[in-house]
């Protein structure tokens, strides 16, 4: 059986903005995309509505393995026009749509491939069943019961004859002739529907009719997010969500925008790589300052990158790579990369020698170890209360008036070290004892003076907090 061209119906055809842009193209285009030496003018607003990865205005080039003919088909689909694919082009178009993030086109290709696989299994029986169910559902909502019994009976008898001829087909019969006797074309089905009055209302009243191939594919393809908005008025679509697209794509060019040297094409070896942040879907434009024109170089200095970012950046640039010459950058769209999850031994290297409990910080392990030893090195200077860690003593000091700092001259309390410093400016330094420091105003004492500089309960760390 010869392969027929595959027809994909674009879901963007009902949008006024896309239709207007397609009618005006190449006028008012603020984007010029270079693919394989060919230039394609487009509107960044229309491209952004189809895929966030394409919503980049200016002059840029695709360096991914996408042919100019395939990219032209993608633009035709995005601008609301149907495309016809020859045998063998469906797979390349699906891969290109997946790489560029055009989800509607990718789903349409997958749906067409699935239908083609089902047709290859048993095309005659499947098409006949679809046509029969569709006509049965259409006649269910038309005319009186007496009028629809006869056509249904005739259609069933005709279907049985066709099925019997399919079963008892001669071995030498050509497959295309057999397919022609078994299939009912979509034009014949639509002609039969239009002959009835109120066919549109009957179709809406059908429980679940199956559409014939090529007739109602528009209802099977999901509409994009910006086409689901209700209409504001007659003939006007409420497509303000496109107009309120985030400002990272910039404003379109006007007729008065001067053409500067930024439109000059840069050589392939001078394109500046720039990674795409998938987690936030934002173009990392702030990495241009420290980037170099050497291919494969990092977008920014390694001193500002985390270790896992340096590791993944050193693996090279994969995925869809585009070069924005007007912004002097190359957009890299790698696959989702996440930092490796740390192992428990690496995240909690300190363990208790008594119970084996692990901790990420050493002072946490030391504080926990005092549970086994019963040591309480921190004591309150106002009462006999003692604590094994600094945080518990800080909470205890709040019971004395939430003023853990006390002036040695007037016994006034202060909530923080800064307020105590401001308070001490009101006293004469001559009244203070020799060797006095501001840290001695904190109302706690530790029985471990040798670790005063490094322990979490030291006056230095407490004053800093």
From Swiss-Prot:
Which stretches does UniProt call biased (Basic and acidic residues)? Answer: 123-139, 147-176
Give an example GO biological process. regulation of cytokine production
Q: Does the keyword Transcription apply?
A: yes
Q: Where is this region: Disordered?
A: 111-179, 285-310
Record SUPFAM superfamilies: beta-beta-alpha zinc fingers, POZ domain
Q: How does this chain assemble?
A: Homodimer (via PTB domain). Interacts with the N-terminal of FANCC. Interacts with ZBTB16. Interacts with GATA3.
| Family the entry assigns | Belongs to the krueppel C2H2-type zinc-finger protein family.
Q: Which PANTHER family match?
A: MYONEURIN (PTHR24394:SF29), ZINC FINGER PROTEIN (PTHR24394)
Give the protein's function: DNA-binding protein that binds to the to a 5'-TGTACAGTGT-3' core sequence. May function as a transcriptional transactivator and transcriptional repressor. Probably exerts its repressor effect by preventing GATA3 from binding to DNA. May play a role in regulating the differentiation and activation of helper T-cells.
Q: What is this protein called in UniProt?
A: Zinc finger and BTB domain-containing protein 32
Gene of origin?
Zbtb32
């Amino acid at each position: 059986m010869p392969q027929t061209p595959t027809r994909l119906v674009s879901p963007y055809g009902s949008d006024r903005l896309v239709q207007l842009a397609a009618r005006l193209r190449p006028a008012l285009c603020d984007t010029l995309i270079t693919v394989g030496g060919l230039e394609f003018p487009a509107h960044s607003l229309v491209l952004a509505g189809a895929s966030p990865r394409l919503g980049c205005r200016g002059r840029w080039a695709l360096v991914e393995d996408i042919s100019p003919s395939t990219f032209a088909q993608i633009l035709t689909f995005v601008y609301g026009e149907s495309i016809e694919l020859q045998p063998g082009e469906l797979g390349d178009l699906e891969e290109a749509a997946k790489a560029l993030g055009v989800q509607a086109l990718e789903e349409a290709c997958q749906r067409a491939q699935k239908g083609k696989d089902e047709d290859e299994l048993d095309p005659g029986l499947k098409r006949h069943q679809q046509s029969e169910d569709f006509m049965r559902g259409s006649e269910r909502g038309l005319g009186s019961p007496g009028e629809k019994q006869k056509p249904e009976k005739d259609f069933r008898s005709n279907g049985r004859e066709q099925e019997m001829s399919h079963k008892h087909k001669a071995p030498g019969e050509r497959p295309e002739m057999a397919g022609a006797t078994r299939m009912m074309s979509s034009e014949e089905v639509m002609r039969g529907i239009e002959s009835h009055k109120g066919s549109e209302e009957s179709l809406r009243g059908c429980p679940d009719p199956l559409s014939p191939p090529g007739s109602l594919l528009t209802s099977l393809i999901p509409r994009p997010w910006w086409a689901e908005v209700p209409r504001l008025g007659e003939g006007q679509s409420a497509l303000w969500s496109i107009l309120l697209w985030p400002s990272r794509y910039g404003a379109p060019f006007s007729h008065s925008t001067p053409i500067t040297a930024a439109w000059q094409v840069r050589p392939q070896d001078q394109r500046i790589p720039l990674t795409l942040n998938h987690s936030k879907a934002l173009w990392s434009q702030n990495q241009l300052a420290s980037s170099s024109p050497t291919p494969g170089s990092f977008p920014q200095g390694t001193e500002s990158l985390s270790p896992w970012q340096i590791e993944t950046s050193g693996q090279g640039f994969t995925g869809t790579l585009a070069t924005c010459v007007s912004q002097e950058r190359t957009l890299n769209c790698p696959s989702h990369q996440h930092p490796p999850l740390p192992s428990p031994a690496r995240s909690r290297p300190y363990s208790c020698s008594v119970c084996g409990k692990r901790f990420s910080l050493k002072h946490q392990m030391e504080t926990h170890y005092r549970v086994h030893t019963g040591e309480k090195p921190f004591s309150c200077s106002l009462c006999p209360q003692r604590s094994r860690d600094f945080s518990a003593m800080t909470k205890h000091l709040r019971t004395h008036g939430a003023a853990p700092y006390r002036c040695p001259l007037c016994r006034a309390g202060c909530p923080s070290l800064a307020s105590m410093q401001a308070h001490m400016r009101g006293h004469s330094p001559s009244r203070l004892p020799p060797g006095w420091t501001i840290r001695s105003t904190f109302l706690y004492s530790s029985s471990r003076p040798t670790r005063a500089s490094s322990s979490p309960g030291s006056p230095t760390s407490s004053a800093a907090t």
